Amino acid sequence: MEKIAFLGLGHMGEPMARHLLAAGHPLVVWNRTAAKAGPLVAAGARATADPADAVRDADVVITMLAGPEAVREIADAILPALRPGAHWVEMSTVGPDTVRELGERMPAGVTLVDAPVMGSTDKAAAGRLGILAGGDAAGVEHILARFGPVTRTGAPGTGAALKLVVNTAVIGGVALVAEAMKLADALGLAEGTARDALAGGPLGGAVARAFAEGVHFGSDLAVKDITLATESARLPAMEAVLGHFAAAAADPDVVHEDIARAVTHIRARRDA
C-alpha cells in the first residue's frame, strides 16, 4: 500500500483522511492546529509538526487547504522534501492559476495532480465526493476513488478550473434563492409556500443547498471562491453575489458557518 501524507485536517480533510486509514494506507498527517490530528492518531495515523517531515517518505502527498495562500506556503515547505516518483495531489479549491504556478515549481520526477472535490462534509464522510482530476492522474486514480467517483478533466489545471465553475454556479444559485426568499418576505408570503414553489422549479437544487443542514461550507470560503472566479472573467452577477457573501463574512457569527446561514443574513440585509 502506498505511503500517504495528508496535509490539512479541516472539515473536509479529516473525514477524507479516515477513508485512507480504513483502506489500510500508512498515513502521516499534518495540520496547522496540531490538536486536530488527535482523532486520526488514535485511529492509526502518525502526526508530525513539520509538513516537510510528513512528505519525506510519502509516495502520495494530498493537500486539502483553505486557499491559494495556504497552498503556496505549504509548497515552500514541502517541495524540497518531495522525493522523485512521488505524486502531489492538490485537492483544495485554488483555481487554475495556482495549479500552473505549482506545476512550474515541481522537482524533477514529481507528478502534480489537481483534484478538487464536489460535495460537502456529508459526502466526504460517506466517501461520495465527486473528484475532478486534472493532469496525469493515472498513478493515483485508485487512491482518489477512495473519496468518490473520479472524473478526468484533461490537462493540468482543468480540475481546478471546473471546480471554480461548479462552485460559482452553486454559490450564485444559493444567493439567488436568498434574494427570492427576501422578495417573498417583502410581499408577505408564507416561507413554506415560497420555498416549496421554488423547490419545485429549475432552482430546486439551489433551494436544497440554501436550506441544507449537517453540511459545512463557510461564507469565508465562498468569498474566496467567488473572488477567484471574478478575477478570472467579467461576471457582473457574481460580483453582486460577492457583495452578499462578503457582508455575511464580515459578521463574526456567520463568517465560518455554512452558507445556509448566509441566506438568513441576505434575507435580513437592509443595505442591499
For each feature predicted by the language model, list its residue ranges.
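Rossmann-like NAD(P)(H) cofactor-binding subdomain of soluble oxidoreductases
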Residues: 34, 51-129
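NAD(P)+-binding Rossmann beta1-loop-alpha1 motif at the extreme N-terminus of oxidoreductases
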Residues: 1-62, 101, 121, 151
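Rossmann-fold dinucleotide-binding core
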Residues: 4, 92-168
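Class I S-adenosyl-L-methionine
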Residues: 21, 38-42, 103-107, 141-145, ...
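Helical "substrate-binding/catalytic lid" subdomain
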Residues: 159-269
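Amphipathic alpha-helical hairpins
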Residues: 53, 60, 66, 70, ...
